[in-house]
Amino acid sequence: MLNEILAQDPNNAFARYGLALEYSNSGKLDHALAEFEKLLSSNPDYAAGYFMAAQTLMKSDRRDEARAMLENGIAAAQRKGDGHAASEMREMLEEIGAEQ
């Protein structure tokens, strides 16, 4: 279903995000990250995409990339005035730092 939506509208952020989550939840992490990359390149202020991409990167033990993703996500959330998303990403960033 999501692939059908994306075939007609490749920039549909909701469908792209949903597909990335499906891949991540099913353990297809490289596919998930590719979808998050597509999502964020066409929707750079989609804050939830950064957060979930960072979580997927952590599942792949790509801590430095997850940190960078969160930093970009915090900036995106601040551009949109989404303090809640920025706060969640700051928390995750602190947790990643504490795990070292």
PLM feature spans:
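Canonical positions in the second alpha-helix
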Residues: 4-5, 38-39, 73
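Structural marker of alpha-solenoid helical repeat scaffolds
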Residues: 8, 42, 76-80
